[in-house]
Amino acid sequence: QKYFDIIALFSREPFVKLITKELEYYTDGSNLIGFICLDLIDNNYSAGILSRDKSMQYRAVKVNVDMQTITEAREWIKKSFNEDNIIQHDNHSEFFDLFKNLNNEKTIHPHYKLLKESDFYSSAKEVIKEISYHYKDIDGNFIDQFQSLNGFDSRIFELYLFCFFREQSFSFKRDFEAPDFIVNKMDKEIAIEAVTISRKPENVKNITDYTPKSPDEINSEL
């Protein structure tokens, strides 16, 4: 369920949870995700199959509704996984790759480097990647700033807000370069500018010169 919540956070409309309850989740071990939900109004079952498109977003490729039992829904999921006619989306949008190599080693933020290369942060990296597939880069420099000394903190904060607003059932309007977010819910629209405090030049230097403590040093301070 937690994995499905991550990949479907921006694929499903926020208010669908008011009329349905997700019950079960399935995968074929490859690119397909299945789910079963209960219709809270009609008290019957619906099921769907999701696959990734070229932008790496999961989208519905098959949906079945008005099934009277969960057993019927499970059988439909099983049958759908075994079919050869599942559509694999193919559109013109390439995926938004926050971790692509920009050959910017001199200006790269060490926290970004740690996030990209350390196995310890691999789970966080995968979650950020899933979120970024749905993020619309309005001004065209998000990836460059996300990797940079001066931009990493603010861009991480923007991704956090992007998730927070969606989890709070807001929808987004991403048609303007400013402000950072225009969100709406219940016919109310809010404009938000994300602001962080820039590091002092000497603190930026401290980041680049920072060497992580060894396990022995850490244990000695506990």
Regions found by a protein language model. Give the residues of each.
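Generic structural hydrophobic/aromatic packing signal, biased to beta-strands
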Residues: 34-36, 47-49, 128, 146, ...
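Interdomain/boundary linker segments immediately adjacent to catalytic/signaling cores
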Residues: 86-152, 203
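A short, sequence-level motif marking secondary-structure junctions
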Residues: 40-42, 63-68, 195-199
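Conserved catalytic cores of phosphodiester-cleaving nucleases, focusing on short active-site segments
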Residues: 165, 181-183, 190-198
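Acidic-basic catalytic patches of nuclease active cores, encompassing PD-(D/E)XK
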Residues: 137-173
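Metal-dependent nuclease catalytic core centered on acidic motifs
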Residues: 1-57, 199-222
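Mixed-charge (acidic/basic) macromolecular-recognition segments
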Residues: 54-112, 207, 214-222
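Long, charged, glycine-rich C-terminal linkers/tails
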Residues: 174-185
